[in-house]
Structures are given as C-alpha cells and as structure tokens.
C-alpha cells in the first residue's frame, strides 16, 4: 500500500467515524486575549485576561490572572457573594468596604507565589418565582471549575491543585463543590462536564453551613427556637426569596418529595465525608445573637461552628474562626492557601 492510499483510507475512516459518532469532540485550544490588569501589579510578572466564556449564558464568564511560569501553577478560584440575587466577579478589584477583605493585596501575594487567580460570574436567581432555584447558580460554578480544568494546559495551571474561595453565597458554593462527591459525567458529550470537580482545598468567609434551609431551624439555630414562618413576619421580602431558592411556587411545596430531594442535593453539610478537602472558614463579622436579620441569619457564627463540629466528628481537617473561637494556629486566609497550594 502506498502512502497516498494509506492517507486516503485513514481520512475515510475518520469521516465515517465523525458521521456515526456524535460523541466525537475535537479539542479547541482556548485563545486568551490579554488586557490591562484592573489592579496595579507593580513589578509582578503576570498577565490578565477578562470575560472568558465558560458556557452558553451571558453570565458564564470569568477573569484570570496568570503568573509568568515555565511550569503549571496552582490556581485559586474566587466565587462572589450577593445572596444569589446580586454581585459580580469584579468585586475583588477593590478592598471590601468594611475592611474585612483586601482582595487586591491578597491577589498580589498569590501571584508573587506563582499562584494563578480566577474570579467567576454565574447566573443569578430571580427575586420572585425563579423556576430553577439555586442549583442553577451552583451548577454554573461547577461548570466554570470544569471548564478551567479542561483548559488547564492553555492556562498553564495544575488542574489537581485548585483551591476554591468565596464570601457569603460564593462561600457556600465553594463548600458545596468541595464536599460534593465527584460530579464528573464521564459519558457526557460535553467534554467540559467530563472533568473532575474535586479540589485541593476550600477557604471561605461569611458562609452558610448548608443550603437545606430546614436545618437552619432544626440544627444551626435550634437553641434560638428559630422558625422561618416567624422570621418572614420580621422580613417579608425573604418569603419570596425563600420560594425562589428551590424554584417553588408556594411554601406548601417545601416538604413535598420533590423539594425534599432538591434540598438534599444542596445540603453540603450532609455531603461531608472523610475524604473531602481541608477547609478554612471565618464567620466573624456578625454578633453572636438571635438571628432576627437577614445578614445575621446567613452569616451567623453558628454556621462556621456547625461546619467545624461536623468536620471534627468525621475527621476532615479544618481551620475555623467564629464568635470568640480562634483556631490554635492562628493561620490566616492567605497563609492557609499558600500552605495548601505548596503541599
């Protein structure tokens, strides 16, 4: 067989394969367009790329800082807060207004240590009558993680050394991803969704312990005799957000089989197993008082306390700060990330 015949046969076989196999997905190299950094980097050697699309929706985008390196680098992914109804990835380009988080300085510290940094957007919930509920937002963040892993070579990152971070809703999302079993769908036609969702570590601030909101009553705030129906009288707007959180049209659906199953899918507390990654958590911004305001309900010290209690009982390493409790090591957010990235 001469060379031309061999090439013709191979080409024909590939053509037939493409016609008969819808699963065939060709690898397209991610093309990055670099722009000016939104924060002054000084003499740090790093590039910045913004609004990279990771999915079909308008808010399926992320920005990334990439340190110059001749080897793949660790990566920190930041997921913004906002109660799943507001917020955006650009929040990290200025220090937090209350002084609790100096994002730009921390980003520069990471870049100096040859650690890349990404910040993502995701779809938000409608304030009233969202048909999909919070899984819409959570699954967007999942896809962002998988997309980045799928393009790890183009981004020069080490896909098995990714640390998730976030505040408020982004904190809870990070924990949901960290404590979920691997959500790789190996038979999916979409190559992105075949990627593992396992991460090296999670570091969060002002988090929620679970998105099964029933456990706010029965577990987290049990000592306060907290009841959602009583809370709705204090904060009527929360009534609509509560329904949208699970895609409910009525609160009467809350204990139905469908919504009970939905709540189970977002209960990261119950997802904890001993093989889950080490985490760092700090809920220090709100007073340790009865949860009678929205920001206290969602950012209370007892969320971090509950996470630590469950993790300790299972055997998951953790560094926690809440109320008057401080981890014996005093390890900071950045120091935790540096330690885990270098392990």
Positions of the model-derived regions?
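C-terminal motif of bacterial Sec signal peptides marking the signal peptidase cleavage site
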Residues: 14-17
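N-terminal cap/lid segment of alpha/beta-hydrolase-fold proteins
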Residues: 26-71
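Short beta-strand-to-loop junctions in surface cap/lid or active-site-entrance loops
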Residues: 62-71, 155, 268-273
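Short beta-strand element of the alpha/beta-hydrolase
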Residues: 72-87
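Short amphipathic alpha-helix adjacent to the substrate-entry channel of hydrolases
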Residues: 90-118
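Alpha/beta-hydrolase active-site loop
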Residues: 131-153
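Primarily recognizes the serine-hydrolase "nucleophile elbow" in alpha/beta-hydrolase
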Residues: 146-222
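Serine-hydrolase catalytic core
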Residues: 211-218, 226-324
């Amino acid at each position: 067989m001469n060379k031309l015949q061999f090439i013709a046969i191979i080409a024909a076989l590939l053509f037939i394969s493409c016609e008969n196999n819808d699963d065939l997905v060709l690898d397209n190299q991610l093309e990055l367009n670099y722009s000016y950094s939104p924060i002054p980097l000084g003499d740090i050697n790093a590039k910045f790329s913004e609004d990279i699309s990771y999915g079909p929706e308008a808010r399926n985008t992320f920005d990334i800082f990439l340190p110059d390196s001749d080897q793949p680098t660790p990566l920190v992914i930041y997921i913004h807060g906002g109660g799943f109804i507001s917020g955006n990835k650009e929040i990290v380009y200025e220090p937090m207004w209350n002084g609790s988080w100096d994002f730009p300085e921390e980003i520069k510290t990471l870049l100096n240590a040859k650690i890349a940094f990404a910040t993502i957007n995701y779809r938000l919930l409608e304030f009233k009558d969202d048909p999909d509920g919070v899984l819409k937002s959570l699954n967007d963040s999942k896809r962002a993680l998988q997309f980045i892993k799928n393009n790890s070579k183009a981004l020069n990152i080490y896909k098995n050394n990714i640390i998730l971070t976030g505040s408020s809703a982004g904190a809870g999302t990070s924990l949901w991803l960290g404590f979920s079993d691997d959500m790789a769908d190996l038979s999916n036609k979409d190559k992105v969704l075949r990627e593992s969702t396992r991460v090296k570590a999670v570091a969060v601030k002002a988090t929620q312990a679970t998105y099964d909101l029933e456990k706010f009553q029965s577990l987290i705030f049990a000592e306060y005799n907290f009841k959602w129906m009583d809370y709705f009288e204090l904060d009527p707007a929360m009534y609509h957000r509560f329904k949208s959180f699970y895609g409910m049209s009525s609160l009467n659906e809350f204990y139905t089989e469908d919504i009970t199953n939905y709540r189970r899918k977002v209960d990261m507390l119950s997802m904890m197993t001993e093989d889950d990654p080490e985490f760092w958590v700090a809920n220090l911004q709100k007073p340790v008082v009865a949860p009678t305001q929205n920001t206290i309900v969602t950012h209370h010290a007892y969320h971090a306390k509950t996470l630590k209690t469950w993790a300790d009982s299972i055997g998951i390493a953790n560094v926690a700060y809440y109320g008057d409790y401080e981890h014996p090591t005093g390890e900071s957010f950045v120091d935790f990330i540096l330690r885990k990235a270098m392990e």
